[in-house]
């Protein structure tokens, strides 16, 4: 009996320490726009990910020269061989289009960035939220090609 009372008191103390007089903070929603899309071109693996510019921290933005002063979406493309090793930048040809729906797609310039000795590529599409943004990536390597199409919702 004493053991049950002590356990109850210990549990109550633990709960009261968690409260600290303020309401619990709700969990942040999962950023579904950060979903990764994957395609293979021969033995090359292409992965793309979209990230709202507002979620990129200032030091990362400065380091990679990303303008986060305006709303929009960053498209990050990584290229690796099937073992996860770097590919030579000239080994694969990439083209990207982007559009704020329902507008027609426009070519987007890609910029190479170096990350841990590997070359990744970024493109930025500036637009005001709320917006639906569509990206299409075409990758070509030694006669093989693959497409990745993705749509992201930019929220306020």
Where are these regions (language model features)?
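Bacterial N-terminal signal peptides that target proteins for export
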Residues: 1-6
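Bacterial Sec-type N-terminal signal peptides, specifically the leucine/valine-rich hydrophobic h-region
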Residues: 12-15
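Bacterial signal peptide processing site
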Residues: 18-22
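Beta-strand-rich domain onsets/edges
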Residues: 23-74
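Beta-strand-rich structural segments
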Residues: 72-83
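Short flexible loop/turn segments that cap and initiate beta-strands
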Residues: 82-96, 103-107
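Short, solvent-exposed, Trp/other aromatic-anchored flexible loops in extracytoplasmic proteins
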Residues: 109-136
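Edge beta-strands of extracellular beta-sandwich domains
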Residues: 146-154
